[in-house]
Amino acid sequence: MNNLNSVFDYEDIQLIPNKCVINSRSEADTSVKLGNYTFKLPVVPANMQTIIDDKIAEMLAKEGYFYIMHRFEAENRAAFIKKMHKDGLIASISVGVKADEHAFIREISAEALIPEFITIDIAHGHADSVIKTIQLIKRLMPQTFVIAGNVGTPEAVRELENAGADATKVGIGPGKVCITKVKTGFGTGGWQLAAVKWCAKAASKPVIADGGIRTHGDIAKSIRMGATMVMVGSLFAAHEESPGQTVERDGQLFKEYFGSASEYQKGEHKNVEGKKILLPHKGSLKDTLKEMEEDLQSSISYAGGRDLSALTKVDYVVVKNSIWNGDAI
């Protein structure tokens, strides 16, 4: 590992501006290439039950955004691939690593239901089980782009890439509804951005930063540290279209948001590493995506460039936990 003393997180970093070369931020190009596809934003909503469902996946794909469907209604996945392909859209699904998931991978391969993207999605992705799953997918569906995770070390990134992963997802428990760090003592909570930097340095393929994103500026910071794509949970939760339950408290509307290993999601009290919270209702998801795009265009203009590559070259300073001056986000 790198120097373990020089760790930092999103709130510790400020990017330093360069001379602006565009007349308006609307000229800035926020698009990103992943595999054989180009997407409108370097952002993907988290593949969680309270963030994405079939309808949202379809809307995102139609509008040119990347998405990853969650794996918590396993029996619907084959039909989902079929429907997306029938509509001329890309299919991007999640799988686990157990025997029944391997059977599912064999089944869709045999039926020629080949998704463009598969994300192997487990909490501790630096595992033999993940390596075996990558190898199985690549053997049966060599054209499918495989994202594997989640990991938090350069060693893990190298191993998963060597096994055949096309991208790795970095982040162990830094998310708002993830309590891995509390329950286990392990994780990248508090130093997620440093983990992204170290992992991206070791990577020869794209890295997806996953977790700990609290503001749109954090997306720009992730790209500066080497992420190709940024997975966002809580910022995408609690919208009009979001799957979570709407709850009214004292005249204000809230929506449920829970972690992928929470008892609410698992329906049990076993191996719980997630919690449930209520977030204020946020209006339309399309409005949030537009605002994200505009903020990222502003970031590019501050970086002195015309596209996302400008963000990878800016200088930054470490200002330990002080950019909020004690204010909560």
Curated annotation (Swiss-Prot):
One of its GO terms (biological process) is purine nucleotide metabolic process. The keyword Oxidoreductase applies. Keywords: NADP, Oxidoreductase. It catalyses: IMP + NH4(+) + NADP(+) = GMP + NADPH + 2 H(+). InterPro entries: Aldolase_TIM, GMP_reductase, GuaC_type_2, IMP_DH/GMP_Rdtase_CS, IMP_DH_GMPRt. GO terms for cellular component: cytosol; GMP reductase complex. SMART domains: IMPDH. The active site is at residue 178. Catalyzes the irreversible NADPH-dependent deamination of GMP to IMP. It functions in the conversion of nucleobase, nucleoside and nucleotide derivatives of G to A nucleotides, and in maintaining the intracellular balance of A and G nucleotides. Belongs to the IMPDH/GMPR family. GuaC type 2 subfamily. HAMAP family: GMP_reduct_type2 (MF_01511). NCBIfam families: GMP_reduct_2, PRK05458.1. This is GMP reductase. It comes from Lactococcus lactis subsp. cremoris (strain SK11). The gene is guaC.
